[in-house]
Amino acid sequence: MKKDLTNSRLDRQNILNNEMAIEEIQNKSGVEGIVWNNKLFVTREMTAKFFDVDVRTISRYLEQNGEELSENGYEVLRGKNLKSFLDAARNSGKDINVPTKTTVLGVFDFRAFLNMAMLLSESEKARALRQLMLDIVIDLINRKTGGGTKYINQRDKDFLFSSLQ
């Protein structure tokens, strides 16, 4: 199996745990949502529209990866939280197409939104966002290490031994 973000939970989590990378990705990606509790949130419908997939596709991924997405910021709003979120949406001027009688609403914070991008294999936009994420993470690593990273030549079985001589 090819190792990439769509099938490696560990690799996904490594990126999602990097707060500097998340902030940089949010600044460069141009994702628009609703700012609520000082965080950017998007609904399932907004997520589906961004990735050019059906809402049922997002729902299917939520069923299959609900635990992972919840750990990374997906939540179902009810009661006072829902009312507060809907007020924030109205104040932002964004129409999120939520009926007035809605009692629950699933929302992704930006981290969970990126997690969904890493899971979605059907979307070209998700693939492009994954590439942007990897480019930003590699760039941050390069900046933190002073410019470049060194790789061990894994093809040469005697490399480690000879480098210690």
Each predicted region: which residue ranges?
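Residues in the recognition helix of alpha-helical DNA-binding motifs
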Residues: 61, 65
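Cytochrome P450 catalytic domain signature, combining two hallmark sequence patches
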Residues: 67-73, 126-127
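Positively charged, aromatic-accented nucleic-acid-binding surfaces
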Residues: 1-60, 77-165
